[in-house]
Amino acid sequence: MLLKALCECSGAPGGEKEVRQYIAAELERIGCPYEIDNLGNVIAHHPGKSGKQKVLFAAHMDEPALMICDVTERGFLRFKAVGTRVTPRQLSSRTVRVGENVMGVVGFAPYHMMRITDEQKRRSAENQHIDIAAESKERALERIQIGDYAVVDSPFIEMGENCKGRAMDSRLGCCAVLELLREAPDKAFDVVFTTMYEVGQRGMEVAAYTQQPDLVVSIGAVPATDIPGSLNKEGRVELGQGVCMALTDAGFAYPRNTVEAWSKAAKEAGIKSRVVQYAPDAAQAGYAALCRNGALALSLLIPCRTPAAPAGIMKKSDLNEAVAMLKLIAEKC
C-alpha cells in the first residue's frame, strides 16, 4: 500500500532523505521525469497538452521531529524539538528511531521524584530524555551522534475503512499527488514534494519562486473535530466528509471566488467535498501565492484525527476523493 510505505519513511525537516528516495523510485517506476533541487525538493513534470494555466501541485515530505543535542554521562540522550508542533505530551513513553536506525524510548522522571512542583515545567521537554539502553556516554556515542534526528516510531495499521499511521499530515498529501501522477490526464502540470515545511516552509519558498505557477494547489491534512472534547469553533470536520477546501488558515485568506468555483466543480463532478472556514495550520498554497508576482492558491485538505501527532487516523474514501479532486483540477486547467 502506497500510504503505508510513505508513513514508514523517516522525514525530519532537512532530513527527508528516506521519503525523497521512495518518491523518486516511484516517479521512475511510472516514467515521470523529475529533478531534485539544491534544497532537496523533488520537482516532477507531467508531460501533456498545455492548459490555460500553469498549475503546480504541492505536498510536503517532512514531519515534526527531534534533534539530539546532548548525551548524559549515563548514556541518556537530551533533545530539542525541530518545528513548532512537537509537544511533550505526545512524546511521553513513545518509541523513537534515532539516526540511522537506533531504537529508543522517550522517558522522564516520575513526578514524585522531581524537585519541580509546577505542572507545566514537569511536562516540559527539558525534563524528558531518550533511553537507548546505553550504559555510558561513550557507549551511546558509538551508536549515535550529536545532531542526529529522531522521529516517533509508530506502526501503520489498517482499521477497516480507516488507517492509522505516523506523519499523516505530510504523507497523505504525498500519497495523493503520487496517485495523481499514476492516473493523470493528458495535461501538462508540475508537482513538487517539498522539504522543511515544519521550520517555515523553506522548500516551498524556493519551488514557487523557480516554477512561477499561475495556480498553486497544496494538499495536506486538516484535524478532524469529530472527537470527544472538541469545541468545533470553526465548524465540524469529520472523517468521511471527502476532501476539504479552506477559506482561511493560519497564514492566508484564499480567494473566495477560486474556492467557490472549485467547490462547484467538485459538486458537478460528483466529488464529495466541503468548504471549511478555517484550517489551523498554514498550508503551502498560501505561502507560494506570495512569491514573485503572486499566484492563485487553493488549499485541499484530507480530514485526519491528530494528523501531526505520532499516530493519526484517516478514512480511505477521503483520500480517494482528494485524488479525484486533483485529477479534476489537472483536467480543467
Predicted segments, located by residue:
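N-terminal hydrophobic/helix-forming segments and targeting peptides
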Residues: 1-333
